């Protein structure tokens, strides 16, 4: 029996009842969660996450408010997640978890928001959105951070509304960038993605954010996306990048005759491009990819590799598990330039000054 077990056998039995989801073991697990041994407490909390129902959530959040042990706090977070994710009614589970927020202190509220992101659903999103509109600066910051990594397209209209109605410039930027992230990463009908791209281009205040939209257009080429890129090209600061996106769509089901007319009307001219040297990697773990890059460099400032992955295009990963960059030295029309690009970024070479 779990209630009579001692030492390592107690931990083994707690793991067993968790695997079997033995609800009757909840009282013994609850008692073990107060044990002096950190290993016993951690095993007990993991077990509680596997067997208790959502009615127990307030006790877990109350415990989260009092613990000073980082590992125990992480175990409590996991238990909260497990309880909600096991629930047959996740909306009801999210509602119960959200109901614990008013009584929680600031740090616990932040952790609850993170858990709601994992649980997902309408109630979770509603709760996080409300936090993003609150007067509490810490809570707002956490809510915007959570919305920035939300796991469904449902957050898009909320992010747009937040962008349009918050006063803080930093939050406006985070909202529109999160909105663009949804357009870039999630499955959705082509019409909706195109509409989101149009909206983002009209709404974003900074050219840097509008350029993120251009990357979305290039990732999902279509006649509609081409039309959006051509519209963006009317903005002087975006003209070059937008036209390069149009070029990048060539050969992917786009009407080539219309593409040629559009490029001629835009006055986009080819350049004389030379790749002087190119290296890919991080620090000393860098490989020379000059010859490979030269194979794909044409007479445009955008270079299209055979794969969206630099590792695939350049024949391997020179620095596994490390953030890498592609550094290129080049000449355009005889003028020397240099650019550093984050891993897998679209290769667009700036005009040298």
Name the predicted role of every residue range:
Residues 1, 8-23, 27-31, 39-53, ...:
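Structural detector for internal amphipathic alpha-helices that build alpha-solenoid repeat scaffolds
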Residues 26, 57, 90-94, 125, ...:
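Core helices of alpha-solenoid repeat scaffolds
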Residues 87, 180-181, 186, 253, ...:
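Mid-chain, structured segments of secreted extracytoplasmic proteins
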Residues 92-99, 192-200, 258-263:
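Alpha-helical repeat scaffolds
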Residues 255-277:
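Pro/Ala/Gly-rich low-complexity, hydrophilic intrinsically disordered segments
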Residues 269-353:
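Extracellular, modular beta-sheet/disulfide-rich ectodomains of secreted and cell-surface proteins
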């Amino acid at each position: 029996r779990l209630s009579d077990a001692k030492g390592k056998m107690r931990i083994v039995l707690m793991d067993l009842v968790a695997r079997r989801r033995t609800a009757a073991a909840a009282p013994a697990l609850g008692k073990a969660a107060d044990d002096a041994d950190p290993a016993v407490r951690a095993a007990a909390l993991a077990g509680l996450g596997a067997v208790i129902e959502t009615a127990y959530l307030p006790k877990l959040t109350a415990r989260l408010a009092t613990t000073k042990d980082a590992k125990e706090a992480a175990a409590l977070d996991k238990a909260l997640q497990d309880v909600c994710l096991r629930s047959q009614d996740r909306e009801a589970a999210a509602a119960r978890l959200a109901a614990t927020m008013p009584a929680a202190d600031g740090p616990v509220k932040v952790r609850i928001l993170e858990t709601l992101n994992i649980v997902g659903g309408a109630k979770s999103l509603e709760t996080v959105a409300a936090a993003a509109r609150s007067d509490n600066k810490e809570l707002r910051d956490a809510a915007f951070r959570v919305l920035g990594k939300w796991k469904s397209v449902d957050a898009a209209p909320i992010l747009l509304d937040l962008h349009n109605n918050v006063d803080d410039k930093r939050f406006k930027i985070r909202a529109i960038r999160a909105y663009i992230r949804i357009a870039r990463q999630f499955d959705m009908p082509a019409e909706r993605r195109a509409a989101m791209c149009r909206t983002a281009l009209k709404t974003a205040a900074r050219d840097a954010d509008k350029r993120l939209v251009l990357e979305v257009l290039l990732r999902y080429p279509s006649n509609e996306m081409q039309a959006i890129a051509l519209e963006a090209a009317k903005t002087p600061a975006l003209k070059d990048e937008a036209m390069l996106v149009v070029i990048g769509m060539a050969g992917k089901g786009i009407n080539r005759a219309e593409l040629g007319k559009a490029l001629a009307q835009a006055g986009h001219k080819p350049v004389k491009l030379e790749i002087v040297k190119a290296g890919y990697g991080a620090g000393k773990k860098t490989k020379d990819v000059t010859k490979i890059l030269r194979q794909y460099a044409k007479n445009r400032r955008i270079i299209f590799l055979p794969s969206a992955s630099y590792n695939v295009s350049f024949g391997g990963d020179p620095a596994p598990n490390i953030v890498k960059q592609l550094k290129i030295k080049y000449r355009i029309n005889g003028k020397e330039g240099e650019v550093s690009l984050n891993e897998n970024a679209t290769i667009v070479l700036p005009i040298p000054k």
